[in-house]
From Swiss-Prot:
UniProt-annotated binding residues for ATP: K262
Transmembrane helix as UniProt keyword: no
Parts of the chain that traverse the membrane: none
Protein name (database record): Glutamate--tRNA ligase
Gene Ontology MF annotations: ATP binding; glutamate-tRNA ligase activity; tRNA binding; zinc ion binding
Motif 'HIGH' region, residue numbers: 12-22
Catalytic activity: tRNA(Glu) + L-glutamate + ATP = L-glutamyl-tRNA(Glu) + AMP + diphosphate
């Protein structure tokens, strides 16, 4: 017997930007499909018209592509199992709604929202978990038909509910959690499978789509666990075999230990936000993979090819995944340091232009200068937008020394070192990094000062920073006129402080 070909799906709702959690779902499905040489389907679940955002699906697809996630079938690619938008599959859903009604497994319900809420309030007052109770209890078929006709005459629009069998256990062997089960009396009563506007509910449409699209494995977030028994009710009613389910654990804020919520503004949560900051897609792909999945060994840096080769759902964690911003920055920095310099240049130049530090029209000479700036500061950048803050001194007038910089210079008698360096700097034949280092060595010989006591005062006076790339390269790019101005301002400030 031939091995069943794996088919997975990522099925977002077009309700906004691509969230980290949704990106993880797409990524794990992608890795699972590619590892097994299977098929990945993209399906747009847009039945909730009120929540849909114009351009939402296009934005999500664009950000998935940016991350390096592609799919084999979808609304933009077609395929043998389309349409791939739920809003275009209404006739398909109606066919199965009718089948269930004809078989007596589903029925029209005319209870109004006010009646349902009153029922829930009464149940709460009695200490009972709110649930729907069958509105035709004890009625004959003719009486039910008459009650429905009366409701229609009043202009009431029905929903369609599916019968939940009594005293049943719905269980599955979860790819992440292991054995999971629900009793039928905990599901909340007969639930809606078609809304008053004629659109199917999520838990009905997803079953129809997964079955007809021959989905074999469903990897999704932990928040869908409670949906699974409802979907199993539908599978059973239609006589279909369900796919294998795997529910990934929650993502929590590593600082607070609380579930990552879109209302938590302490963490950027949308892929587009990280794109705007200049994070690299390969780094984001790497980081998101580690949110709830553990590789073999200690390494944390992997190429996409390596992750596809090694991905095994058995290594998905049963514990919540901690979103650690510092770890993301560290991972991205590893990629920045080895990234193609043309890619970094494009990102950093865009950041500098958005900040108004570089004009929209850039001459070849200016472009080469920015390229060198990016090259020497790449090692410091967790993401490329940081270049705006760490290189502002190259574009703006020098600020006064900070208190920390003054304290650093005060540790030793730095004035003679700074004055001698200015003298040596203005004596070099060419203003290059090599010649700048020669000037520093000449300062060492003339003053007898070496090590940190030599380099730190020079770095602070010339570049207005206590950290940075090679001091020779930084001073060369800053230019002779600007460096001299910085040194003069430093000496004046020291004089004003009586130093």
């Amino acid at each position: 017997m031939a091995k069943q070909k794996i088919r997975v799906r990522y099925a977002p709702s077009p309700t906004g930007h691509l969230h980290i959690g949704n990106a993880r779902t797409a990524l794990f499905n992608y890795l699972f499909a590619r590892h097994n040489k299977g098929t990945m389907v993209l399906r747009i679940e847009d039945t909730d018209q009120k929540r849909n955002v114009e351009g939402g699906s296009k934005s999500q697809m664009e950000n998935l592509h940016w991350l390096g996630i592609d799919w084999d079938e979808g609304p933009d690619k077609g395929g043998d199992f389309g349409p791939y938008r739920q809003s275009e599959r209404k006739d398909i859903y109606n066919k199965y709604i009718k089948q269930l009604i004809d078989e007596g497994k589903a029925y029209y319900s005319y209870k109004t929202e006010e009646e349902l809420e009153a029922q829930r309030e009464e149940q709460r007052a009695m200490g009972i978990a709110p649930h729907y109770t069958y509105e035709y209890e004890g009625m004959t078929a003719d009486e039910i038909k008459q009650a429905q006709a009366d409701a229609e005459a009043k202009g009431l629009k029905p929903v369609v509910r599916i019968h939940i069998p009594e005293n049943r256990t719905y269980a599955w062997d979860d790819m992440v959690k292991g054995k999971v089960s629900f009793e039928s009396d905990t599901i909340g009563g007969d639930f809606v499978i078609q809304k008053r506007d004629g659109m199917p509910t999520y838990n009905f449409a997803v079953v129809i789509d997964d079955h007809l699209m021959e989905i074999t494995h469903v990897l999704r977030g932990d928040d869908h666990v409670a949906n699974t028994p409802k979907q199993l009710v539908v599978y059973e009613a239609l006589g279909w075999e369900p796919p294998k389910f795997g529910h990934m654990t929650l993502i929590i804020n590593s600082e607070t230990g609380k579930k990552l919520s879109k209302r938590d503004e302490s963490v950027l949560q949308f892929i587009e936000q990280y794109r705007d900051l200049g994070y690299l897609p390969e780094a984001m792909f790497n980081f998101i993979t580690l949110l709830g999945w553990s590789p073999v060994g200690e390494s944390e840096i992997f190429s996409q090819r390596e992750l596809i080769k090694s991905f095994d759902p058995k290594r998905l964690s049963k514990s919540p995944a901690a979103f650690d911003q510092k770890k993301l920055e560290w991972i991205n920095n590893q990629y920045v340091k080895k990234a193609d310099r043309d890619v970094l240049l494009d990102l950093a130049l865009n950041n500098l232009q958005e900040a108004g530090l570089v004009g929209k029209e850039v001459s070849p000479e200016k472009m080469e200068w920015v390229r060198q700036l990016v090259n020497i500061y790449a090692v410091q950048m967790s993401y490329t937008k940081q270049i705006v803050d760490i290189t502002k001194i190259f574009f703006e007038e020098a600020p006064e020394l900070s208190d920390a910089e003054v304290e650093e210079i005060k540790k030793d008698d730095a004035r003679p070192v700074i004055e001698e360096f200015k003298k040596q700097l203005n004596a070099i034949p060419r203003f290059t990094a090599v010649q700048v280092m020669n000037a520093i060595q000449a300062t060492r010989r003339e003053t007898g000062v070496k090590g940190r006591k030599l380099f730190m005062p020079i770095r602070i006076a010339a570049t207005r920073s206590m950290v940075g790339p090679g001091i020779g390269e930084a001073i060369e790019l800053m230019g002779k006129e600007k460096v001299n101005k910085h040194i003069d301002l430093t000496l004046k400030q020291l004089s004003d402080l009586g130093l």
